[in-house]
C-alpha cells in the first residue's frame, strides 16, 4: 500500500506551530443531499458560510455531498476530470472566498474504468489550492433484509494512505467505511486530526457509528472530525447523521443528530499534547507491520 504524505507547510512554520500553536475552531457539515449537483452545491455553500462565520479554520463536508443519485450510476454520469469540473471549482472557490481549509467530502472523479469512478476526498487550503487527494480504499458492501449496497459496482478503490500538513497540524484523510479498518489509521503515523466524511446507513450507523468514531479518536489520541449525511433522501435511502467532533480522549464535543446543519468545536493542541504525554500509547506500539 502506498502512503502519500502531502507537505504544504514550510519547515519554519512547522517549528513555530510546535511551540506556539493555540486553540482554533473546526466545523463539520451535515447534509441530506439529493440527485441534483447544483442544488447540493448551493446548500453546501450556505452551510460553509455559516461555518465560516463561527471562525472555523477547517470546514469538512460529508461523503457524497454533491450528489446522492436516484441510482448508483448517477455519480458515474456526474464524474469529473481530475482538476477540472463544477464540484472542484466550487470547493476551491469557497476555500478562497472564506479563507479557510475545506475538506471536500467526496467527489466522483474519472477512473481507469469507464463504468466506475474514484470516490475522492479533496482538500483545499485557504488560497483555494488543492493540497491533497485521497481515493477511498475500502468499498462498502452490505446485504441485510431489504438493504443491499455494493460500492464496488461503481467505484474503483484507491490504494494510497493520505496525510497532509496544515497550519493546524497533520491531517489524516479517510472516508466512511474506512472507519472499520483501524490499520489504515495506523499507517497514517502520528496525525493530529482525522477526517472521516461519511454517509452511514441508518441501520449500520445506529449500531456502530458512535463506537467507531470514538475508538479511532482514542486509539490514535487524535481529534476526529466526522461530517455525515443525515436524514431521508429523495432516492429512498435513510442515512444516520450524527455528525460529530470528538477529542483525543473520546469525548464528543458537539453533534447533530439529523438534518442539515453545522457542528463546531474547538481544537486545543496543548490539551492533546498533555494527553499524549500522560498516555503515550503511540510510543508503546510493539507490532511494527505498519
Regions found by a protein language model. Name each.
Residues 2, 37, 45-127, 202-222:
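Cys-nucleophile CN-hydrolase/nitrilase-fold catalytic domain and related Cys-dependent amidase chemistry
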Residues 10-58, 195:
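N-terminal active-site segment of His-dependent metallophosphoesterases
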Residues 30-32, 62, 135, 228:
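Residue-level recognition of beta-strand->loop/alpha-helix junctions
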Residues 67, 73-74, 122, 133-140, ...:
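Short beta->alpha transition motifs characteristic of CBS
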Residues 80-83, 112-189, 202-211, 276-281:
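Active-site catalytic loop in hydrolytic enzyme cores
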Residues 82-103, 170, 176-263:
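CN hydrolase (nitrilase-like) catalytic-core segments centered on the catalytic cysteine
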Residues 104-106, 120-123, 162-164, 243-245, ...:
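Short beta-strand scaffold segments in enzyme catalytic cores
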Residues 272-290:
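A conserved C-terminal secondary-structure "cap"
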